[in-house]
Amino acid sequence: MADDLGDEWWENQPAGAASSPGASGGEGGGDTEMTQQETAPGPALSKKVKPPKECFLIQPKETNEDATKTRKRKKKKITDILAKSEPKPGTPEDLQKLMKDYYSSSRSVIELEELTLPDSCFLKANDLTHSLSSYLKEVCPKWVKLRKSHSEKKSVLMLIICGSAIRAVELIRSMTAFKGDSKVMKLFAKHIKVQEQVKLLEKRVVHLGVGTPGRIKELIKQGGLHLNPLKFLIFDWNWRDQKLRRMMDIPEIRKEVFELLEMGVLNLCKTESLKLGLF
């Protein structure tokens, strides 16, 4: 027995005995803990935190094409639409509709019906092929006879209503072939006082008056111009200014025109002693 124990007995143990958990008891768990401690990372070393650097982004320059794409679409103006569309001549129905639209919020249905004018009071409208002289010759073929028989002061036989003093001067120049020996008077406010025009109407016989509705209204109010002898009232309806606006497209002018019509013009039209024309 003693000799057997002296041998290196551990060399004769099976290979799995040393590594088995039962043989080693608590030693195996200690080895595992050692391994975990060795492999576990240690606390991170404190490093100096560098302040963040500012970063500047250089934006690419905007080209003309990009600007065109990002530009907002412009709203179409009435002048742009009218510039591309063909002009349409005014009609008596246009005047009737404008009048009813203007008074629709302030008049009753019965009062609006009273504003309606008979078709017989309208002259043939300009179809955009006439000059002023040719149009007046067509709608007033007996003008020379009327002119010769007119002798009443503070009145005219024909009124031509337009939107501005400059336009009134242009119309007077363009009617030379029609007026002949007729006496023409400018009826607008530019450089001419109302009192001066009243005196001129009192002194001499005038056949034709060309002017703005505002000044004509004022002359009627002050008694300088009587409407009873009036035979023709012509609106410069189709002409457009630099902004492509017609006379009746301008709110101030439209208001004055309708106020003028109510100062006795509508009543004269209904009795058919006065004719309306749209040039």
Swiss-Prot record:
Residues 1-94 are annotated as: Disordered. Residues 1-10 have a biased composition (Acidic residues). It holds the Pfam family CMS1. SUPFAM superfamilies: P-loop containing nucleoside triphosphate hydrolases. PANTHER family: PROTEIN CMSS1. This is Uncharacterized protein C3orf26 homolog.
